[in-house]
């Protein structure tokens, strides 16, 4: 590198979060096959840096998970986009999310669905996520502290269900709360080294069909004690 180019690089202002976010979508999401325009738009608009601990914000737009405390993580951006696309977004649809965590996935879903119902078992994480939802004025997200294995029966049925933590098997309560014609997407597997994204579709008659897709690695889905 010649001295003039080095000097210009040193003088250049640091890349801001907005530019980092657009680069993340271009280099790590769109380039890897995500095509849904609504999903790409949501990923471009949603400030991931607000959902990570302040000391990790410099890594907010890198394509990898980050710890958010209490043994939990915010998922890799590509996986967030992939699962959102696999769900099949729709502005007239209602979605149940199991595992609010940082709130980032719910924020993405809020731009893709009419209503988002999200359950978090750890009260402190739910409170942190709700604070960011309020900051971003995301008024179509409804948060509940509770056991994700039981779902949210009072608001059922749901057109879509998304799991952001991995149970050994898909809880029957979540299948029951899935509307006819609905779809569930989530990681499944007790062994973190042998988890797969699973898609369950329920037809109009209530029969379900299951298919296994990509290998993944998620934190375990923890039941209430």
What are these regions (language model features)?
Residues 17-22, 32-36, 72-80, 98, ...:
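Solvent-exposed, acidic/flexible segments
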Residues 7-55:
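N-terminal auxiliary segments of SAM/dcSAM-dependent transferases
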Residues 1-7:
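Sec-dependent signal peptide recognition
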Residues 26, 31, 56, 60-93:
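Conserved alpha-helix/loop element of class I SAM-dependent methyltransferases that forms part
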Residues 212-222:
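Short, solvent-exposed aromatic-acidic interface loops
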Residues 88-209:
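Conserved nucleotide-cofactor-binding alpha/beta core module
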Residues 27-32, 42, 46-49, 86, ...:
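Structured segments of extracytoplasmic/periplasmic soluble domains
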